[in-house]
UniProtKB/Swiss-Prot annotation:
Expressed at high levels in brain and testis, and at low levels in liver and kidney. GO terms for biological process: response to retinoic acid. It comes from the Eukaryota. This is Ganglioside-induced differentiation-associated protein 2. It comes from Mus musculus. Residues 248-275 are annotated as: Disordered.
Length: 498
């Protein structure tokens, strides 16, 4: 606490000049306004908005000094990173912050977690973990960084926060190019304020002297302060400006779905792209599965010459598109909170690693329809490239087990791309019962999977295919493996800093 009568070291965000008020180039822009409106075709996807600009602040200073509802701390997955932002926050917040962080048990890349602000002027601290950057895996890094900003803002919205102070989430030691990262930061915040920002009054970008120039350069692209600045900035926008939420988009991953489900099938077929799909690695029995009809009957029709293979593929494709459309519109936050399915690093061949935690799937307690939709929502953009699945069967019980009838139905529903690009399934800590069940399932139901299943009795075996630094292990998996196979893994952290 400051001595009585001494000036406070903290800065109230309401005293800071907004981005919109900082514009001095054109005091009277009536002529340019008229001119810009005449050139409708030249409008930017990030149009001039006085309201949005009034909510944004660029401030050179320490984010820990901001007096706002919440500030953002960038850290590593164990929330113990030593960087200037974190060290300042910890110093000013006091020792209670470290105790509170221990209860969180880490934070995965792209996630956001909340603690109190303690001795800070800010009521809360939102902790997030930015990605490490490697040009080879640029798309994954972009998606993770987007998730950082998006999840911070989503948390602020859910907690009814009126003001948020952002540090620069990408840290220099993680190698993310500042300008590339700033594009993602600005467009994500812009899109969120447009769509969900009705209750957010201030978003402050707290930057260092080195970072300020980049933000000054790029802010006009996403937050133009006049119509003239909007038009002037348009040629400098990058080709990839993300989707409607600002999320990075890879062109070959985009699909077109009819906005009118009742439209004729001819029109629907014209609107669909090839190569959408899902794999069998998750859960749920859904009424949508019946949209496709009886698959065995369809196969009989094929044999009888009554239904061509091409016609069946089109019908199958339409069915998956309905699943995907529903997955994108449904609120799946309750399923996401289970942390049963998530993306981690890459295997030794550079393929994306997806993790399924069997113990986190309470089959008898959750809405299996929504679980399947969540699987599609997560996997749709993953399965366009080669990937592997790591399934932790560790310490599962009967109510975590999926029956073979459902898995067979799910396998029949998914698209060929998901099956083709799935290169391996690592079944970690199997039991005798699970090995027998898997053998029967892959022998008599889905023979195409049989050669891809690898039973892994210890984590040491898994490391021959995937480096331990590339997997985010649930703590109970590490504890079980150390108990059953020896404590050789003790040198690896439970939440590797990917």
């Amino acid at each position: 606490m400051d001595p009585l009568g001494a000036p406070s070291q903290f800065v109230d965000v309401d005293t800071l000049l907004s981005w919109g008020d900082s514009y001095e180039d054109e005091v009277d822009c009536a002529d340019s306004t008229a001119e810009a409106f005449q050139e409708d075709a030249s409008r930017s996807p990030f149009v001039y908005s006085r309201d949005v600009n009034g909510k944004v602040v660029l401030w050179k200073g320490d984010v820990a000094l901001l007096n706002c509802t919440a500030i953002v701390n960038t850290s590593n997955e164990s929330l113990t990173d030593k960087n200037p932002v974190s060290e300042s926050i910890f110093m000013l917040a006091g020792p209670d912050l470290k105790e509170d962080l221990q209860k969180l048990k880490g934070c995965r890349t792209g996630e956001a977690k909340l603690t109190k602000g303690f001795n800070l002027a800010a009521r809360f601290i939102i902790h997030t973990v930015g990605p490490k950057y490697k040009s080879r895996y640029r798309t994954a890094a972009e998606s993770s960084l987007y998730s950082c900003y998006r999840n911070v803002l989503q948390l602020a919205k859910e907690q009814s926060m009126s003001s948020v102070g952002f540090c620069v989430i990408n840290s220099a030691k993680r190698g993310y190019p500042l300008e590339d990262a700033t594009h993602i930061a600005l467009r994500t915040v812009r899109r969120f304020l447009e769509i969900h920002g009705e209750n957010i009054e201030k978003v402050v970008f707290a930057v260092s002297e080195l970072e300020e120039a980049t933000y000054q350069k790029l802010l006009p692209l996403y937050f133009p302060r006049s119509l003239k600045e909007e038009i002037r900035s348009l040629p400098y926008l990058p080709a990839d400006i993300g989707n409607a939420e600002g999320e990075p988009v890879v062109p070959e991953r985009q699909i077109r779905i009819s906005e009118k489900p009742g439209a004729s099938e001819d029109n629907e077929e014209e609107d669909e792209d090839e190569g959408l799909g899902v794999d069998l690695s998750f859960i749920g029995s859904h009424a949508f599965a019946r949209m496709e009809g009886d698959i065995d009957k369809q196969r009989k029709l094929i044999l009888q010459g009554q239904l061509s293979e091409a016609a069946l593929q089109k019908q199958h494709q339409r069915n998956y598109n309905r699943w995907l459309c529903q997955a994108r519109s449904e609120d799946l936050s309750d399923i996401a909170s289970l942390k049963a399915l998530y993306q981690t690093g890459v295997d030794n061949c550079g393929r994306t690693v997806m993790v399924v935690v069997g113990r986190n799937i309470p089959v008898t307690l959750i809405d299996m329809d929504k679980a399947l939709l969540y699987f599609i929502h997560v996997m749709d953009h993953i399965a366009v490239k080669e990937y592997v699945l790591v399934y932790f069967h560790t310490l599962t019980s009967d109510y975590n087990h999926l029956d073979s009838d459902f898995l067979k139905k799910l396998y029949d529903v998914v698209d060929i791309k998901y099956k083709r690009n799935l290169k391996a399934v690592y079944f970690v800590h199997p039991t005798f019962r699970s090995k027998v069940s898997t053998w029967f399932f892959t022998t008599f139901s889905v023979s195409g999977l049989k050669d891809k299943i690898h039973h892994v009795d210890s984590l040491q075996q898994l490391f021959s295919a995937i480096s331990p630094e590339q997997i985010d292990f649930p703590p109970f998996v590490l504890e079980y493996d150390a108990r059953e196979n020896g404590p050789y893994f003790a040198s690896y952290p439970p939440s590797p800093d990917l």
